[in-house]
């Protein structure tokens, strides 16, 4: 791809077709800063579908649905100190901020994106493995009536 081959990429057309956030994400994630990169519209679409729609979109959809269904749309308060250091999400969460900060400082935007995607994928895997919706037990009629009877 290049001017001499008369097949340059028009970023304005790409943005008009897919939106600036999608274009920005792809180039930050897939093409290392300061290095020539290779662009394919097919690859562009595949990356967006796999990482943003499937991985991130799926995580947001599942998490928000569970928050709405089980916690009245609120984020429950959790004491982070009560979560074991060996918990897979905590292990990543502890190091993620520093890792992304260092990646940004060294212009390693591709690495920063990949670090965040590891967290997203680990969250999805955790949800798949633990099936939290099956662990939730609504308050039974007995639990509601016992305090009343005791009074």
Regions found by a protein language model. Name each.
Residues 1-87:
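Catalytic adenosine-cofactor/nucleotide-binding cores of aminoacyl-tRNA synthetases and other
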Residues 142-148:
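Conserved small/polar residues in nucleotide/adenosyl-binding loops
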Residues 60-100, 120-140:
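Conserved, charged catalytic cores of large soluble enzymes
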């Amino acid at each position: 791809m290049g001017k001499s081959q008369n097949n340059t990429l028009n970023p304005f057309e790409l943005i008009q077709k897919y939106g600036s956030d999608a274009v920005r994400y792809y180039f930050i994630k897939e093409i290392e800063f300061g290095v020539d990169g290779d662009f394919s519209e097919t690859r562009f679409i595949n990356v967006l579908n796999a990482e943003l729609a499937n991985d991130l979109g799926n995580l947001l959809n599942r998490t928000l649905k569970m928050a709405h269904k089980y916690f009245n749309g609120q984020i429950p308060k959790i004491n982070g100190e009560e979560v074991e250091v060996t918990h897979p999400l905590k292990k990543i969460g502890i190091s993620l901020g520093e890792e992304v900060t260092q990646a940004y400082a060294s212009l390693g935007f591709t690495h920063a994106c990949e670090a965040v995607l590891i967290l997203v994928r680990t969250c999805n895997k955790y949800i798949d493995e633990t099936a939290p919706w099956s662990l939730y037990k609504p308050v039974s009629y007995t639990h509601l009536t016992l305090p009343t009877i005791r009074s």
